[in-house]
Amino acid sequence: MQGVPDLSDYGEDVYDLQFGNGTDHLPTSALIKTEFRRKILYHMCSQEDSNLAALLLKPGPLQAILGAKFDQGSPVDAVPRIFIKTVQDRVITPEQQDAMIEKWPPENVYSVDSDHSPFFSAPFMLLGLLVKATASLPTI
């Protein structure tokens, strides 16, 4: 499915798919299977944080990913954007992040040496970048 992260390096059966509209329709949400989560999502997190994150993780709605649009000139362009790259991300690779930045350019780009979950693996670095980003944006 276009727009869904390619995790084929980890095998063919990485996702638990939910079929909210019945199994004769496309899946409505997905969740990375338990046995892959630490390796893919939380490889830079402590075991304790990885366990906590696993308890909090919920299925992601596929339509939100598949239906995302980046229309130029729409009212949403008036909202300042920043992008924080997660350099060690195994879900959305740095190359994919660069493509996202190019497709819908933000005001500023920051980087954090983190996996897909910087709020667990690098919370203080993430906080510092959020403060820096907030200070750099014009007041509304």
Regions found by a protein language model. Give the residues of each.
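Short, charged N-terminal helix-start/capping segments
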Residues: 11-21, 47-58
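Eukaryotic N-terminal low-complexity, Ser/Thr- and Lys/Arg-rich leader segments
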Residues: 22-23, 131, 135-140
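Conserved serine/cysteine hydrolase catalytic core
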Residues: 48-51, 55-120, 124, 128, ...
